[in-house]
Curated annotation (Swiss-Prot):
Assigned protein family: Belongs to the glycosyl hydrolase 18 family.
Function field: Carbohydrate-binding lectin with a preference for chitin. Has no chitinase activity. May play a role in tissue remodeling and in the capacity of cells to respond to and cope with changes in their environment. Plays a role in T-helper cell type 2 (Th2) inflammatory response and IL-13-induced inflammation, regulating allergen sensitization, inflammatory cell apoptosis, dendritic cell accumulation and M2 macrophage differentiation. Facilitates invasion of pathogenic enteric bacteria into colonic mucosa and lymphoid organs.
Protein name as annotated: Chitinase-3-like protein 1
An example Gene Ontology CC term for this record: perinuclear region of cytoplasm
Lineage: Eukaryota, Metazoa, Chordata, Craniata, Vertebrata
Main location: secreted
Subunit description: Monomer.
GO molecular function ontology, one term from the record: carbohydrate binding
Binding site for chitin: 70-71, 97-100, 141, 204-207, 263, 352
Amino acid sequence: MGLRAAHTGFVVLVLLQSCAAYKLICYYTSWSQYREGDGSCFPDAIDPFLCTHVIYSFANISNNEIDTWEWNDVTLYDTLNTLKNRNPNLKTLLSVGGWNFGSQRFSKIASKTQSRRTFIKSVPPFLRTHGFDGLDLAWLYPGWRDKRHLTTLVKEMKAEFVREAQAGTEQLLLSAAVPAGKIAIDRGYDIAQISRHLDFISLLTYDFHGAWRQTVGHHSPLFRGQEDASSDRFSNADYAVSYMLRLGAPANKLVMGIPTFGRSYTLASSKTDVGAPISGPGIPGQFTKEKGILAYYEICDFLHGATTHRFRDQQVPYATKGNQWVAYDDQESVKNKARYLKNRQLAGAMVWALDLDDFRGTFCGQNLTFPLTSAIKDVLARV
């Protein structure tokens, strides 16, 4: 009896360890609060047991010091970090930068010793004051000249976190978001060097295709399509992951991005297959109100009366209705991606973003909140 109980306990321990082995990094965007009606999302909508890490996007930098961006950021910080009262194992990070921040602003700060030092010194007290467990650097698309400055910034930030933790507090986490395009990686990131100082890297394995290409195509294919032109051979998650590993990113620090949004296009003709011409981005969603992009919960609405298809080679779906063509991820495709990253022995998955998933559970007809993120979690939790 004692042996059986001990064995059962061991099995339970192994299961818990295997579940904890994979990270599920989930971004929340502060501007989602401004969406109308059921599209409005606040941090208290987040299930505290869904993700291992939640990253709040974005913080600003003012006078070379980390700062809030939204008028009510401090309130939302508190709401988010209160989730840890229900799940003490949840880690929260604050992401600084983002697409709208501008690479030049980062460059200006990182390239000068004094401004870089001022920024770095401002981070730990800010994170501690507001209850965060770490910082996520979202310096997107640095240039050739920025590469060594980014490396120095990461190295010195990590050193500051180590120094600050000597007072007896748990060391702050440091992560970075890195675009998945080969050209962007080559131009701005010394992957081997920054990997040494980061706790994990979120690889943005989406936005491989958009309306700027003048034709339809999927923004987040897992694999290269059979009909892809040679110029598109790098534009898939499999290539990006393999390339990052080849450059020296340790698999146990690499997190693969999975989008909960779709890319939409307005067709220019009756053609709907790969390479069909477009006249521009798709019409804005009811809640996100941005041309060419739809939240998953808006896609669920779009699918009523639409014709759905699946790229078998790329392992991702798309749908057509009238002159609208929408590439997206569904539960099947995100599960395939989660299985893939497990096979590659990566650190886990990243989701952009919780507020673009069906966070209310009312749009997609399953009576399930966060259906895409939950599907990823289910696969990661399996032994």
